[in-house]
Regions:
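Radical SAM enzyme core and accessory elements
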Residues: 26, 31, 46, 91, ...
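Structural recognition of alpha->loop->beta junctions
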Residues: 87-106, 240-250, 306-321
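Acidic, low-complexity intrinsically disordered segments
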Residues: 1-190, 361
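A structural motif corresponding to the C-terminal end of an alpha-helix
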Residues: 19-29, 190, 277-288, 314, ...
Length: 436
């Protein structure tokens, strides 16, 4: 299971992008993340913006109501709004849909004039050239492990039925990327050569990725990113990734059941190619962070043990598990609602760590217990030993993540409260990669 370290991983880049726009327009801005700074200022603001995912929409409504009672106008955006603007319109007076770069200047102008509209939306013609690097000047990063996170793009060219991106695509959203010059400039501005790209899909445009990595090659980075399984079809790009310092790739394998994958539109994933995919990364010294979703329609109680067996047999370095969750606005939600299988409408439980649907081939209790069991089994000391990476250079980062983030994460969390989470992150980076 994840500890609250996950929520303290890095600042929210969406809010920091808005902060950049606000600063560019000549205004003062303060960014607060409730995960790392629960004391929210209550006065001294002319406008409040809230970014929310589905699971915190209700919290956003409560918080927004508190500010409105103080006479402060409130606008709400984020993936929870962009993926289902109709639902959000019922909850909030003013919503923002799509990339902030396409409408936040209008929000600021209208707020200054006292005439906020009900809805602001970035048009479908929005160009990735308009995407901005975020500003970190307005946020206290000491409550986060890292501030070396960069998003080179927004969205994903795929639209898997259970993913936020499938809902966003229904409302005109699409994959766009920044310019190579913009991303490279942001990389160079960081005080570290360790970079985490947090794009939904770092190879959404393989041509862009190749051009970007070629530009970054001289910097000699250590970096990680998330990619889709079709990276296996791009051996030249994998070679370039390894040559430019790629340490780990997050990949949504999602299931060891082919029927489960086909049932949610995950056509780019082929179970028969999973072993080759893992080997393609390992042979280049790149670690695999495998994501799995449990509770899909072909899953049954045996799925959990088979997943653990596959992970151990293929020496997968890290595993992230999720419970199948029907985000409102997605095709998966529509089908679960149509089939009468949604058993919990409390949006705060839509965080992939609660069972909110009735699975086909097991009970909700079996699904939850199996989800927890995968975490426990993958991160036993014995299985951590069995999954040791072949590449010696990856041994220290592997052990740090498996032991001090997953297995003993609670102890690392306590250390963060004692010395500061930013210092914990800096110590981990130096121990793993011998760089600042």
């Amino acid at each position: 299971m994840d500890t609250s370290l996950k929520a303290r991983m890095a600042p929210h880049l969406g809010l920091l992008t808005i902060a950049r726009i606000v600063e560019d327009c000549g205004h003062e801005v303060v960014v607060v993340n409730e995960n790392s700074a629960p004391d929210i200022p209550s006065a001294g603001f002319d406008l409040v913006g809230i970014s929310a995912s589905i699971d915190v929409l209700d919290r956003a409504r409560v918080l927004g109501g508190e500010y409105r009672r103080l006479g402060v106008p409130v606008v709400v955006g984020g993936i929870g709004v962009t993926s289902n603007p109709d639902l959000a319109s019922e909850m909030f007076e003013t919503i923002c849909v799509g990339p902030a770069e396409g409408h936040w200047r209008d929000v600021l102008a209208d707020a200054a004039a006292g005439r906020l509209r009900r809805r602001y939306e970035t048009p479908m013609s929005f160009s990735g050239e308009r995407l901005l690097a975020p500003s970190f000047r307005s946020v206290d990063t000491r409550g986060c492990l890292y501030d070396n996170v960069i998003a080179a793009s927004r969205g994903c060219p795929f639209a898997c039925d259970f993913c936020y991106n499938a809902a966003v695509r229904r409302h005109g959203g699409r994959y766009v990327h920044r310019t190579v010059e913009s991303v490279a400039s942001e990389v160079r501005s960081k005080a570290t050569r360790h970079i985490m790209f947090i794009d939904d899909n770092f190879i959404g445009s393989p041509a862009f990725t190749r051009e970007l990595l070629a530009e970054l090659r001289p910097i000699r980075l250590k970096w990680s990113a998330a990619v889709s399984a079709n990276i296996l079809d791009m051996p030249d790009l994998l070679d370039l990734m390894a040559e430019t310092g790629c340490q780990s790739l997050f990949i949504g394998f999602e299931s060891v059941n082919p029927e489960s994958l086909s049932g949610v539109g995950k056509g780019q994933n082929k179970v028969s190619r999973f072993e080759a995919l893992a080997e393609a990364l390992h042979s280049r010294g790149i670690m695999v962070n495998a994501s799995f979703v449990f509770g899909l329609d072909a899953d049954d109680p045996s799925t959990f043990d088979r997943t653990v067996e596959w992970v151990v047999a293929n020496r997968i370095e890290t595993v992230t598990s999720h419970i199948a969750t029907p985000y409102p606005g997605t095709p998966f939600y529509d089908r679960m609602r149509r089939e009468g299988r949604i058993i919990d409408d409390d949006l705060s439980h839509y965080d992939t760590a609660h069972v909110v649907i009735r699975p086909k081939n097991m009970t909700p209790e079996e699904l939850y217990d199996g989800y927890l069991r995968v975490y426990r089994e993958v991160y036993t000391l014995g299985n951590i030993w069995r999954r040791l990476p072949r590449a010696r250079s990856q041994l220290m980062p592997y052990l740090l993540f498996n032991l001090f983030y997953r297995k003993w994460g609670a102890a690392s969390e306590r250390l963060g409260h004692l010395i500061g989470f930013d210092r914990v992150g800096a110590l981990a980076r130096r121990a793993a990669y011998f760089i600042r």
